[in-house]
UniProtKB/Swiss-Prot annotation:
Native species: Enterococcus gallinarum
ATP-grasp domain: residues covered: 129-316
GO biological process, alphabetically ordered: cell wall organization; peptidoglycan biosynthetic process; regulation of cell shape
InterPro entries, A to Z: ATP-grasp (IPR011761), ATP_grasp_subdomain_1 (IPR013815), D-Ala_lig_Van_CS (IPR000291), D_ala_D_ala (IPR005905), Dala_Dala_lig_C (IPR011095), Dala_Dala_lig_N (IPR011127), PreATP-grasp_dom_sf (IPR016185)
Chain's gene name: ddl
Protein name, per record: D-alanine--D-alanine ligase
Cofactor(s) it depends on: Mg(2+); Mn(2+)
Biological function: Cell wall formation.
Cofactor binding annotation: Binds 2 magnesium or manganese ions per subunit.
Intracellular or extracellular location(s): Cytoplasm
Positions of ATP binding: 162-217
Pathway: Cell wall biogenesis; peptidoglycan biosynthesis
Residues that, per the record, bind Mg(2+) 2: E301, N303
E.C. designation(s): 6.3.2.4
């Protein structure tokens, strides 16, 4: 059977996608599967690369814009093949948000992972919080802020945020991943700058209460029969980890299993399974939690296409 690995993409997480793709092609059991490389460039061009029958030794093989491994331009619809399945490894907007899933369903091509609605809701931090809060899964206090509302009445936004939350606050674009566009604010001036930064990536932002907490992650796998892994913990040398500390500076590592009480471990797995089920998850996802020193768990987010890079795989 052929796996069509779809990676790259137009989002700010293009490079993360290539790292994930390299991990996947090195994990495939080639006695049973072949891997067809299809890369979406930063400007949206689709390139068809090699058909892999064994694991590549170099990451450069996946960069289909490299002259040594130049891919052949194709139309998106040409990805459709019989006896094949697409594995989308497109992180962030235009990949993890339901757009590519909708396209694949339109052309009748089976794919790995969450469907359109789950992908769209899971990518949108505001929608995720609304749905999972209604399901009884604890969240840190937050305030959603739309760009138009901010432009029309910034003073009211400040009052709303400062009336509901305490500094420090974390400001995030609603539809980005890999900590892109996330800023910590200690005062009103920093809050203003942080919102402006978030609006570079999205017209909707979310302001969250900053808390002192450990960061716990649970991998989820399955469709109707849902399984969870033992929780892992992100151990970091920075106050909070942004894109650089995640992927460039090697300032974090994953400790598996997390050194937490059995009761907390079971609760994290229960919440992860419930979040996955309530959002209609399928294939795989990763649930991220905050854990306070009082052993309180708060859901941070659910990732429907988690990064799988070998150097620091956050899919425990």
């Amino acid at each position: 059977m052929k796996i069509i690995l779809l990676y790259g993409g137009r989002s700010a997480e293009h490079d993360v996608s290539l790292l994930s793709a390299f991990s996947v092609v090195n994990a495939v059991y080639y006695n049973y599967y072949q891997v067809q490389l299809v890369m979406i460039t930063r400007d949206g061009q689709w390139l068809k690369g090699s058909l892999l029958t064994e694991a590549p030794t170099s990451k450069e093989v996946l960069n289909l814009t490299d002259s040594a491994y130049q891919g052949t331009p194709i139309q998106p619809g040409e990805i459709k093949e019989e006896d094949a399945i697409v594995f989308p490894l497109l992180h962030g907007p235009n990949g993890e948000d339901g757009t590519i899933q909708g396209f694949l369903e339109t052309i009748g091509m089976p794919y790995v992972g969450a469907g359109v609605l789950t992908s769209a809701c899971g990518m949108d931090k505001i929608m995720t919080k609304y749905i999972l809060q209604a399901a009884g899964i604890p969240q840190v206090p937050y305030v959603p802020v739309l760009k138009n509302y901010w432009k029309e009445n910034p003073k009211k936004v400040f009052e709303q945020c400062e009336g509901s939350l305490l500094y420090p606050m974390f400001i995030k674009p609603a539809n980005m991943g890999s900590s892109v566009g996330i800023t910590k604010a200690e005062n009103r001036e920093e809050l203003q700058n942080a919102l402006q930064e978030a609006y570079r990536y999205d017209t909707r932002a979310i302001v969250e209460q900053g808390i002192e907490a450990r960061e716990i992650e649970v991998a989820v796998l399955g469709n109707e029969d849902v399984r969870t892994t033992m929780p892992g913990e992100i151990v970091k040398d920075v106050a909070f980890y942004d894109y650089n500390s995640k992927y460039l500076d090697n300032k974090i590592e994953m400790q598996i299993p997390a050194q937490i009480p059995e009761e907390t471990q079971a609760k994290a797995q229960e919440f992860a399974k419930k979040a996955y089920t309530m959002l209609g998850g399928s294939g795989l996802s990763r649930c991220d939690f905050f854990l306070t020193n009082k052993n309180e768990l708060f859901l941070n987010e659910l990732n429907t296409i988690p990064a799988l890079q070998a150097e620091f795989c956050r899919y425990p």
